[in-house]
Amino acid sequence: MTAFQRHRGATLPALALTAAIGLGAVSACSGSGTPAPTTSTSTSGGSQSSSPSGPTGSTASTVRLAAVGDMNNDGNTSPTSATGEVASSILAANPELVLGLGDYQYPKGTCSALVEDYDKVWGKVLPLMFHIAGPNHDWNSTSDEEGYRRHFAGTCPGQTTGPSALVRSEHTPVGPGDFWSRDVGAWHLVGLSTGLWRFDQGKAEAMTRTLDRDLAAAKARGKYLLVAYHDPYFTSTTDQHGPDKAVKPWVDVIDKYDVRLTLSASQHNYERSCPILESDACTPDTGPGTTAFNVSTGGVNLRSFVNKPPYIVKRFSDTYGWLALSLHPDGSFDWRYHPVVGSSTDSGTRPAPRE
């Protein structure tokens, strides 16, 4: 059985599009200092603030997520395009949450392009979306945040969609360089901004410290961990991109706390790694190590591979689609790639970690 098919008898919590959206509230502001443990938080750059939050859904429940990045081509408004079919397929599957993995609108996510193009095909998904930003297409510098910040807050001129689930839960806009995290059932989700390594290394280093504190607190609460960031570290090379070595400090922290899986995009193809350590060594499914998914098949042009790292165990570059994940209370998870244009797919289960 694969993602979105088995639920181990658990009753899945409905996604309420309120401040809590069934997952707990978050706070967002600029600040400094070491945060107290909290179920959820959002920060600007690398400085973290926290606030009390309520229950984040039963820890006995399986959580159903969809994930994809690299979505809409310049000028496209067609619901029957590849990206339109991906969006429709996600909505038909009725996930509780959609993780947007960055690069939403090409070539540049300005307010006008997002409203006039992106929202025509992805607007109905926005209320379900938690999101991270990709550098260049979503923002180009620390002073280039308006399109991303305003669109996901639902405040671009002429916008009739949004705000996103993430912004709605926070009651405040979220910028492309912001950190966010939250508990979802037995799991803890984190969103990072790889653009900071290009645009403001000081903030990227601060975010590394924030990540370390956040994962330590989540681990102490007994949570299983998922981290999303746009530019992948564990990936094959294409004619445009190779592994993003700048994010290695984050990979070290991810390895330190035995994060179960990461989600990235950017490469315009699909990949899955073995459970892998920061040293590039594969480990058993029930051991430590992170399963790294690259899901950048949301509708923009696909790219072939020019090498094959030994840790990549499944990949293809000929099929548009999205990844379904079922995160179970014992730390196991199922995945299934849903093809919508093309026929390649991937599915499986990683069992619960050994105690």
Residue ranges and their predicted role:
Residues 303-355:
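A short C-terminal boundary segment appended to hydrolase-like catalytic domains
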Residues 25-28:
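C-terminal motif of bacterial Sec signal peptides marking the signal peptidase cleavage site
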Residues 30-55:
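Short, low-complexity, disordered segments immediately C-terminal to signal peptides
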Residues 62-75, 186-196, 226-230, 290-296:
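Active-site-proximal beta-strand elements of phosphoester/diester hydrolases
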Residues 2-16:
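Bacterial N-terminal signal peptides that target proteins for export
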Residues 54-113, 117, 205, 236:
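N-terminal active-site segment of His-dependent metallophosphoesterases
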Residues 109-221, 240-250, 255, 261, ...:
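Extended active-site neighborhood of metal-dependent phosphoesterases/phosphodiesterases
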Residues 218-237:
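Short acidic, glycine-rich surface-loop motifs adjacent to enzyme active sites
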